[in-house]
Amino acid sequence: MSLVIDIADTIVSLTALIGLIITLIKFHSQNKEDAIMQIRKIAQEEIVNFLDTDKFKHSIIDIMNESNVNSKVNDIDSKITQLLAILCYTDSKLKDTELCRSSDRSK
Protein backbone atom coordinates (compact mmCIF):
# COMPACT_ATOMS: atom_id res chain seq x y z
CA MET A 1 0.00 0.00 0.00
CA SER A 2 1.26 3.44 -0.85
CA LEU A 3 2.69 5.66 1.83
CA VAL A 4 0.13 8.29 0.85
CA ILE A 5 -2.75 5.90 1.45
CA ASP A 6 -1.24 4.89 4.80
CA ILE A 7 -1.13 8.55 5.78
CA ALA A 8 -4.70 9.15 4.63
CA ASP A 9 -5.84 6.10 6.62
CA THR A 10 -4.06 7.47 9.67
CA ILE A 11 -5.80 10.83 9.29
CA VAL A 12 -9.22 9.17 8.98
CA SER A 13 -8.54 6.95 12.00
CA LEU A 14 -7.32 9.89 14.06
CA THR A 15 -10.38 11.91 13.13
CA ALA A 16 -12.69 9.05 14.05
CA LEU A 17 -10.96 8.78 17.43
CA ILE A 18 -11.26 12.53 18.01
CA GLY A 19 -14.95 12.35 17.05
CA LEU A 20 -15.48 9.55 19.54
CA ILE A 21 -13.75 11.52 22.30
CA ILE A 22 -15.82 14.62 21.53
CA THR A 23 -19.01 12.56 21.64
CA LEU A 24 -18.07 10.97 24.96
CA ILE A 25 -17.21 14.33 26.48
CA LYS A 26 -20.52 15.80 25.34
CA PHE A 27 -22.35 13.20 27.37
CA HIS A 28 -20.09 13.06 30.43
CA SER A 29 -18.63 16.52 30.97
CA GLN A 30 -20.32 19.35 32.82
CA ASN A 31 -18.32 21.96 30.94
CA LYS A 32 -18.82 20.56 27.45
CA GLU A 33 -17.82 23.62 25.43
CA ASP A 34 -14.43 23.99 27.14
CA ALA A 35 -13.67 20.31 26.67
CA ILE A 36 -14.67 20.35 23.01
CA MET A 37 -12.61 23.48 22.34
CA GLN A 38 -9.59 21.86 24.01
CA ILE A 39 -9.91 18.74 21.84
CA ARG A 40 -10.27 20.88 18.71
CA LYS A 41 -7.11 22.75 19.67
CA ILE A 42 -5.21 19.50 20.20
CA ALA A 43 -6.49 18.07 16.90
CA GLN A 44 -5.50 21.23 15.03
CA GLU A 45 -2.00 21.17 16.53
CA GLU A 46 -1.62 17.49 15.63
CA ILE A 47 -2.62 18.10 12.03
CA VAL A 48 -0.20 21.03 11.71
CA ASN A 49 2.59 18.90 13.21
CA PHE A 50 1.70 16.06 10.84
CA LEU A 51 1.90 18.34 7.78
CA ASP A 52 5.41 19.38 8.83
CA THR A 53 6.74 15.81 8.97
CA ASP A 54 9.17 14.41 6.43
CA LYS A 55 6.86 11.42 5.99
CA PHE A 56 4.11 13.69 4.65
CA LYS A 57 6.49 15.69 2.44
CA HIS A 58 7.96 12.50 0.95
CA SER A 59 4.48 11.17 0.26
CA ILE A 60 3.73 14.27 -1.83
CA ILE A 61 6.90 13.62 -3.84
CA ASP A 62 5.79 9.99 -4.26
CA ILE A 63 2.47 11.16 -5.70
CA MET A 64 4.24 13.34 -8.22
CA ASN A 65 6.46 10.42 -9.28
CA GLU A 66 3.61 7.89 -9.61
CA SER A 67 2.76 6.73 -13.11
CA ASN A 68 -0.89 6.34 -12.14
CA VAL A 69 -1.48 9.68 -10.43
CA ASN A 70 -5.24 9.67 -11.11
CA SER A 71 -5.69 6.44 -9.18
CA LYS A 72 -3.77 7.85 -6.22
CA VAL A 73 -5.74 11.08 -6.32
CA ASN A 74 -9.01 9.10 -6.35
CA ASP A 75 -7.84 7.05 -3.35
CA ILE A 76 -6.97 10.21 -1.45
CA ASP A 77 -10.27 11.84 -2.45
CA SER A 78 -12.11 8.82 -1.07
CA LYS A 79 -10.25 9.10 2.24
CA ILE A 80 -10.91 12.82 2.48
CA THR A 81 -14.61 12.19 1.82
CA GLN A 82 -14.64 9.67 4.68
CA LEU A 83 -12.88 12.19 6.90
CA LEU A 84 -15.42 14.89 6.04
CA ALA A 85 -18.32 12.53 6.70
CA ILE A 86 -16.95 11.75 10.16
CA LEU A 87 -16.37 15.41 10.96
CA CYS A 88 -19.80 16.49 9.70
CA TYR A 89 -21.46 13.77 11.78
CA THR A 90 -19.56 14.35 15.03
CA ASP A 91 -19.12 18.12 15.17
CA SER A 92 -22.35 20.06 15.73
CA LYS A 93 -20.80 23.36 14.61
CA LEU A 94 -19.54 21.80 11.41
CA LYS A 95 -22.95 20.20 10.72
CA ASP A 96 -24.38 23.69 10.28
CA THR A 97 -21.83 24.74 7.66
CA GLU A 98 -22.63 24.96 3.97
CA LEU A 99 -20.04 22.28 3.26
CA CYS A 100 -21.87 19.64 5.28
CA ARG A 101 -25.36 20.74 4.28
CA SER A 102 -24.68 20.93 0.55
CA SER A 103 -22.83 17.63 0.42
CA ASP A 104 -25.38 15.97 2.72
CA ARG A 105 -22.50 14.17 4.45
CA SER A 106 -23.88 14.81 7.93
CA LYS A 107 -26.68 12.25 7.53
UniProtKB/Swiss-Prot annotation:
GO annotation, cellular component aspect: host cell membrane; membrane
Main localization, broad class: host cell
Topology, Extracellular side: 26-107
Cytoplasmic side of membrane: 1-4
Keyword Membrane belongs to the record: yes
TM segment ranges: 5-25
Subcellular compartments: Host membrane
Coiled coil segments of this chain: none
Protein's membrane topology: Single-pass membrane protein
Keywords: Host membrane, Membrane, Transmembrane, Transmembrane helix
Protein name according to UniProt: Uncharacterized protein ORF107a
